[in-house]
């Protein structure tokens, strides 16, 4: 089928991070947003995230935080990518690229209506990847809500996305193949779909996810797309 980038987000425990990385996923996501169920404080993140073995990408997830604070987290922890999950402007993303050369940027778009995809073009020159997530009025992510995959497929045909993109929103080992039958994302992002409870990952569910993908010939991509000149200013 091709290559697929697989990110497991909302990691809170070192033992689970190491076990999931050993299964061969592309990336682990760590939530740097206080007062959220999967928040991992800077002191804890700095203690072990940067030293995780292997080529796995280490993605910090931020929500409307000051670019200077984000840069400090990246440098302190040793993150290899940042995911911006709020209302960050293209200017914020561009500034992060100038401060953090070599760090990939993922801009999340919460899709509620067709117009939500139109803003994707605003970010084409200041991030390396987009993430499409289901809209929730109280939560920015990890809600368990799925997108309308057939409708998203139609919209993405009409409004071709300008960058590689990740599909998020309610994915789990039992529905991921159905989602991929409708869509052709560059990768997938799972959180609640591979958990026992928020922040407590179920390693068997992650293993089952990878087995499901492998059964249909998907190969797991080792890294995010390379940084291109157009995304560095």
Curated annotation (Swiss-Prot):
CDD domains per UniProt: PRAI
Sorted UniProt keywords: Amino-acid biosynthesis, Aromatic amino acid biosynthesis, Isomerase, Tryptophan biosynthesis
Entry-linked InterPro entries: Aldolase_TIM (IPR013785), PRAI_dom (IPR001240), RibuloseP-bd_barrel (IPR011060), TrpF_fam (IPR044643)
Pathway: Amino-acid biosynthesis; L-tryptophan biosynthesis; L-tryptophan from chorismate: step 3/5
Reactions that this protein is recorded to catalyse: N-(5-phospho-beta-D-ribosyl)anthranilate = 1-(2-carboxyphenylamino)-1-deoxy-D-ribulose 5-phosphate
Molecular function per GO: phosphoribosylanthranilate isomerase activity
EC class (word): isomerase
Listed EC numbers: 5.3.1.24
Gene Ontology terms describing biological process: L-tryptophan biosynthetic process
Family: Belongs to the TrpF family.
Name this protein carries in UniProt: N-(5'-phosphoribosyl)anthranilate isomerase
